Amino acid sequence: MSVDQKSKPSQKESLRKMPEPEDQDPTKGPKKVEDLEVKDAQLIFHTVWHELEQEFGGENLRFPAEIFWLNGSPGAGKGTQPAFIMEFRDLTEKPIIVSELLKSPEARKKIDAGMLAGDREVTKLVLGSLLDPEYESGAIVDGYPRTKTQVECLKLFHGKLSELRSKHLGTFQESQFPKPRFHIIMLFIDEEESVRRQLLRGQRTIAHNAEVEASGVGESWEIRK
């Protein structure tokens, strides 16, 4: 047998060396960042944090000393509970309502273009709003987190604030980076009662708007869908 014949790989060896089907498919290039963001909470959070650093400056990322994260089914009382929290914790600013943030010009531009407001966009809107100096003493966030990815982002956010606290401990900026205090509030309600309250709220809104239209006095209420 010649040297060339001896060095020739067997059929079994050739099959073993064949690339996987995914590597052979020319239509499948390297994974895009957008694809990873859908699943990777760390990528989402660190991307958002980097963007905030670029926009505001790292030393200006000062968040509220205390944050209440409020969630619950429609009709569970998310609209009424904040008043009690504000009174109890001596907060003066109205809650940050995620559904309202999604009506902002930036968010509407993406939605109108057929793009969904995903975890990355929502997380950035929420964190960006919390940087407002008016929330320095504390804030209530209504409607975040709502997905598993957002829950993981919230954990990373708490970790980052703890990291900033440690970094500035013992410095003249210590008071500007307080120890993070997160309160997770979940309001529960059974389905039947939820439906009843939503119907009642809708009826009251319709009646109020009809009165405003007839009298020309007052402001119309938004009909929630």
Give the ranges of each region predicted by the language model.
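Glycine-rich phosphate-binding loop of ATP-dependent small-molecule kinases
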Residues: 1-225
